[in-house]
């Protein structure tokens, strides 16, 4: 049997021979779980995480020899990416608060934070850079006359800090819009301006005005915020946006705004709990996930510890998810380099997450870990939770959650049934047809899409005779979940053009009807494409990207069975079509289509057909069956293939 895994392991090892051979942390296995029955004490949780953060933030600060001028490199990676110094400020602030230390690596914390803020002020830092500065300043008191950070600044430096804390750097007060940014940045602006008001830097009218603008979608009754109004982009940012606006309203005592946001928080927290994986991973679709999906879990649990009314589960169970996420991030942390391995072999990132942001993402992880642990440890001790499960006891789930109703509804089908678990979203992405946002079973063991790539991942691309490629995505025309939640029916009469702007559906004379069903441990997808008038499909193609390293193909007569074997899952895939489908397999190496959010996508199975002529009453149908519980049958013959047969 040919092993793709072995070839990839060799390829991954070659660049590692160049630097000094220092042992790194064990790499996490996607979807790995702690043994059932294991428990963790609260004391261990607090001691382990606090000790790590204390040592690592000191190591990071020691790696910054001077702040004037700021170094171009820290720990061997660039510092010119977005939010660099603001994230570092937040990490130092939260770790100092967690440990109770006033000095780190021999440096006075308030004075160091004051210098870091001046770097961001002079670089024109915006959004999360400003948020980090506001949180750092407020940590030392809202009375600036007694605030040691503020007192460490000269009068001209205080003017620079005031400019840094002005949300007008990215919020247009006249138009009441964030400037060229997604909707969730209203939450960032609201947190900054309300902290500014707490510290006497802006008047109450401005704080209330911006807060009301940030709360607009919630005021209109939205449970899930559209991050790109009005296109219908729903992803991880819905929960972050809701948390941010709720916290901002709390800063200025706006209970009315908090109550407007409360229904959203109840909904998004339940959805997060229904989709979180056993290893603590959050939203499996959309942008800015990967390691951030685990940081989200820590952030969310910290929020829920402080706000018990929104908890979807007991605190001890939430702590189990927190611990699982922490363990994954520890496995991803390169202690020899003091960095998260976000650009390791087979790791994909959205285009804005450049190598210039590796250090920033690492310090952001430290900040989120320290900030969330402060809330979690307080709640665990107050509620006398001495220990909790190392693996979160996640409930069985089979339901559809609506994001938006109307002519083009959106939502997500959530399934957690034994080994079969996934989230299948109906939403738009930054570009039509991008794999991260397709209505595919994201999080399904053994299945993973490459990051920010155009790949027909279990959702076909159809190339028409005029050269356009279309896909059934960007919400749907009809979404009908079954009564028991174990099936779903969706219809697309309007399609989107792959690579084009989102939410611009086109009528090409075709209708796609898709039925998903759970059959034991098998997920079944059946699609029927019908024509209202003759339509030539120059090429039909659909892909199955997998985390498996080994492919074994078995034939039973004319029926092909593909077995996908990897660390995460052993799956069997059967694909059939009413017209013959060519099958090929591609080993991706370290190409763009081989980079997943959490690790490599070593292999892609491609199914295709050319020159299909669809006419009324003669539909094209294809079916895929994905069994996550496959075990080899005794005496069965097998062959391995990487090409067409």
What are these regions (language model features)?
Residues 7-23:
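Bacterial N-terminal signal peptides
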Residues 19-33:
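Signal peptide processing junction and immediate N-terminal pro/mature segment
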Residues 32-111:
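Low-complexity, Ser/Thr/Pro/Gly-enriched N-terminal "stalk/linker" regions
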Residues 44, 48, 52, 87, ...:
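Extracytoplasmic/secreted proteins, especially bacterial periplasmic and envelope-associated proteins
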Residues 76-301:
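Aromatic-lined, polymer-binding surfaces characteristic
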Residues 278, 282-285, 292-597:
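Extended polysaccharide-engagement surfaces of secreted carbohydrate-active enzymes
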Residues 576-645:
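Beta-strand-rich recognition/accessory modules
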